[in-house]
Amino acid sequence: MPLIIVALGILALLFLIMGLKLNTFISLLVVSFGVALALGMPFDKVVSSIEAGIGGTLGHIALIFGLGAMLGKLIADSGGAQRIAMTLVNKFGEKNIQWAVVIASFIIGIALFFEVGLVLLIPIVFAISRELKISILFLGIPMVAALSVTHGFLPPHPGPTAIAGEYGANIGEVLLYGFIVAVPTVLIAGPLFTKFAKKIVPASFAKNGNIASLGTQKTFNLEETPGFGISVFTAMLPIIIMSVATIIDLLQETIGFADNGVLAFIRLIGNASTAMIISLLVAVYTMGIKRNIPVKTVMDSCSTAISQIGMMLLIIGGGGAFKQVLINGGVGDYVADLFKGTALSPIILAWLIAAILRISLGSATVAALSTTGLVIPLLGHSDVNLALVVLATGAGSVIASHVNDAGFWMFKEYFGLSMKETFATWTLLETIISVAGLGFILLLSLVV
């Protein structure tokens, strides 16, 4: 019954947004209230669940999104994004530009959370699409494919790292096998899928105009832009800071030296929000003050960036409310009961449970972590490689992202797509990542 309620809730949401043309945020709130009541949630818990969902989601990403939007806007308004774009175009050529985006996104995706990588790469990818006069989606699909694969499969991302700890898997093996699975999966879900998507939703690839969330884009002569080195450094600084902190953290876990004040300070600096604040302050200097741009002009760019993402943040928060209602309403517990006593292979079972929880709850990390408790009892009676079970759980947890997932709304709003176009691109892309990932994991299980 809970899964039927979830399905009806999703259909109601689609009707409100696509049929009645109701504002997306309002629609999410209305459906969240309705689904909460239908699931039998006590009246005094409904509002608190919705507030917790909005607060929990925005508490995680509001700072990152806000600071990332300002950082991206400064790099774009100074001409730094255009300089990076023009240099990549010149080095790789128009024919190979997709591969440049895939490589850059994969490297960035290893170090950064999905949403951080997205807000940093969007201005650069948009600048490339404008420079070459090609569809933003032609580059956007490979970009998000690389970011999503690294988020689902590779440590030090929270999902794979936490799952490995729960299963007792060797983190080095997870990383090694994760790379083996991730590379072909990105190629299939990125450049190859882009060709297919262009056939099923050609209208979405015709959208080469400005992205509303980035505001009006300026164009520059090459000599007016900052140098390539300083532009890349400014854009990559959050990645550098977080990567250094992560490496030191991993060394501490591996070597086992004691915690101290220095390590605590490094973790503080390496936190995504702290790294973004530091990077933004550096960008104010490198993209503004150093180039004799008045501080007021720089701050105007920051203010514009914030004003342009307000509705996007509310929509993402609304998605978080829907997700929390499903979790608090007991949908996850219902799914757990369905799989008690099953005799399926741990790899397939881990993928299947994570997939159902992902579709039902929306959060990849919640789906992955919830799966571990159901799969762990089966691992004692199996000789399956634990690293592969970790990867299978990660693969299942990214499947079929839809309206209860913040990533769905990020992709839709950033690329200016309709609901139908978002389902045909983003949702299908995430499903391909999940299914292709499982396929490569099963192949790998034959030899390891």
From Swiss-Prot:
Pathway: Carbohydrate acid metabolism; D-gluconate degradation. It is a multi-pass membrane protein. It comes from the Bacteria. The chain crosses the membrane at residues 2-22, 23-43, 52-72, 106-126, 134-154, 174-194, 228-248, 269-289, 302-322, 347-367, 373-393, 428-448. It holds the Pfam family GntP_permease. InterPro entries: Glcn_transporter. GO terms for molecular function: gluconate transmembrane transporter activity. It is found in: Cell membrane. The keyword Transmembrane helix applies. GO terms for biological process: D-gluconate metabolic process; gluconate transmembrane transport. Keywords: Cell membrane, Gluconate utilization, Membrane, Sugar transport, Transmembrane, Transmembrane helix, Transport. GO terms for cellular component: plasma membrane. Belongs to the GntP permease family. NCBIfam families: gntP (TIGR00791). This is Gluconate permease. The gene is gntP.
